[in-house]
Amino acid sequence: HQTRINYMPGFKGSGFYWHSDFETWHAEDGMPAPRAVSCSIALTPNFAYNGGLMVMPGSHRTFVPSLGETPEDNHKSSLKEQKIGVPSEEVIADMAHRHGIDQFTGPAGSALWFDANIMHGSGNNITPFPRSNIFLVFNSVDNALQDPYAATAPRPDYIAHRNAEPLR
C-alpha cells in the first residue's frame, strides 16, 4: 500500500498525535476494511526518550471513525501534522484506560508489526539522539482500494499505491 520514512531529528523532531492509519486509508484512499499491516523498522536506535512509537495493544478491534468530509489535498499537511481524522481526547483516554500503552524501543534493525487499525502516536524528540524508522505497509489483495469514503479524490499514487496485483 505504501512505504515511508519517519525522520525525527535530535532536538526538533515533531511527534505525531494519536491516530489509526486505517481511518485515513479508509477515508482518503478508499480502503474498504482494516486488512493491512505495517512493519516499522528502526533505522536508528529507538529509545523511550527520543520520540519512540507508542501503541495501544488491542485497540485495533475498535474502529474510531472521523466525522465529516476530508478537506481537499489534506495529505499535503497531514503527513507532517494530522489534524483531521484524529480521535477526541475522551476516546483516546477511554482506549488508553482499556488497553494500556506500550512503546516500541530497540536498536537499529529492530522491527514492530502492527495492525492498520491500532491506535498509535509518538511524542516530540527533544533529545540530541535522532530517531528514524522506515514503515512498510502491506494491504491484502482482497482489499483493493476503491473511491475514497470521505474525500473528493484519492491521494496521489506515490502516497497510496492503488495496484492490488499480488506480488509474485
Where in the sequence are the language-model features?
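Aromatic-acidic/polar surface patches that form glycan- and anion
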Residues: 7, 32, 98, 102-107, ...
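Histidine- and/or cysteine-centered catalytic micro-motif in compact active-site loops
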Residues: 21-23, 42-46, 58-60, 68, ...
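Short histidine-centered beta-strand/loop micro-motifs
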Residues: 17-20, 25-30, 104-105, 123-127, ...
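Double-stranded beta-helix
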Residues: 48-118
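Short, conserved beta-strand element in jelly-roll/cupin
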Residues: 26-48, 84, 105-108, 113, ...
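Non-heme Fe(II)/2-oxoglutarate
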Residues: 68-72, 108-113, 117-168
